[in-house]
Each structure stands twice: as structure tokens, then as C-alpha cells.
């Protein structure tokens, strides 16, 4: 199966030369997703929970555009700007993965947009 680019309708312009998702051999790779609007402005500044919800809704859109659901997500890379947001981010994260949880790692680091509190990248196995 050839590589397929996945760009959901209404997706804004990326900050760099990448696409929201790439599907290859049934595996969807979702790029690092920041809490951005269509003009690449950070939304919900200062609210880690709202930013996490925005990020996960964006990821959900990419997964669905590839023909999957959030149940198909098998791995997440979670990047936090501040460990103080860990509990708030986890509370929202748990809403999107209520049953079987995907594997993940979580690290604190600087993000490309200083107002962003969280960035998440994902891997999903579509049609498993």
C-alpha cells in the first residue's frame, strides 16, 4: 500500500513542512499537534485542559479522516511545557481514551509556540 497523506477538511496551514497525518500499510502517523486555530494562533492561552481537548479533537479529526477511531490509537507522545499541568492534561486525556489505553510517554520540554501548554503526536493502527 503506498503512503497516503491525511489532511482533514478545514486544516490550517502547518508551521513547518509537514502534514497532519501519513498513512502507510494501515499505520497512521499523526504529526505533533499543538493547540492552534486555522491561522496557527495558540487557542485557550493559559488553560492546559482546554488546550489538551483542542489537541485531542484535532488528532481525532486526523484519525477519522484516515478511516479510524480513537480506539485505533496505539501510542501517544505527550510533550508538556510545565509539569504543573500534568493532572489537568491527564484528566482530559482520560476522556478520549476511556477503555483500553494506548501506550505513551510524557516529557517536559519547550514547545515551538511559547503560549502552548501541550503538544501530542499519535500512532494509530487503522482497521486492526
From Swiss-Prot:
**GO annotations of cellular component type:** cytosol
Q: Identify the domain of life.
A: Bacteria
> Sorted alphabetically, which keywords does the UniProt record give?
Hydrolase
Q: Which reaction does it catalyse?
A: (Z)-3-aminoacrylate + H2O + H(+) = 3-oxopropanoate + NH4(+)
Task: Give GO BP annotations, semicolon-separated.
Answer: nitrogen utilization; uracil catabolic process
Q: Name one GO molecular function term.
A: deaminase activity
Q: Where is the signal peptide?
A: none
Keyword Aminoacyl-tRNA synthetase in annotation: no
- EC number(s) per entry: 3.5.-.-
Q: Which InterPro entries match?
A: RutC (IPR019898), RutC-like_sf (IPR035959), YjgF/YER057c/UK114 (IPR006175)
The job of this chain, per UniProt, is described as: Involved in pyrimidine catabolism. Catalyzes the deamination of 3-aminoacrylate to malonic semialdehyde, a reaction that can also occur spontaneously. RutC may facilitate the reaction and modulate the metabolic fitness, rather than catalyzing essential functions.
The family classification in the record reads:
Belongs to the RutC family.
This one is known as: 3-aminoacrylate deaminase RutC
Q: Which organism is it from?
A: Methylobacterium radiotolerans (strain ATCC 27329 / DSM 1819 / JCM 2831 / NBRC 15690 / NCIMB 10815 / 0-1)
Q: Report the gene name.
A: rutC
Amino acid at each position: 500500500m503506498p503512503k497516503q497523506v491525511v489532511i482533514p477538511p478545514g486544516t490550517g496551514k502547518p508551521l513547518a513542512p509537514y502534514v497532519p497525518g501519513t498513512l502507510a500499510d494501515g499505520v497512521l502517523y499523526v504529526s505533533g499537534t499543538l493547540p492552534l486555530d486555522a491561522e496557527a494562533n495558540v487557542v485557550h492561552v493559559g488553560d492546559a485542559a482546554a488546550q489538551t481537548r483542542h489537541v485531542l479533537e484535532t488528532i481525532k479529526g486526523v484519525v477519522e479522516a484516515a478511516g479510524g477511531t480513537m480506539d485505533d490509537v496505539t501510542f501517544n507522545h505527550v510533550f508538556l511545557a510545565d509539569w504543573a499541568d500534568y493532572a489537568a492534561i491527564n484528566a482530559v486525556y482520560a476522556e478520549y481514551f476511556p477503555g483500553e489505553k494506548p501506550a505513551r510517554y510524557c516529557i517536559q520540554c519547550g514547545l515551538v509556540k511559547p503560549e502552548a501548554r501541550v503538544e501530542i503526536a499519535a500512532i494509530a493502527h487503522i482497521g486492526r
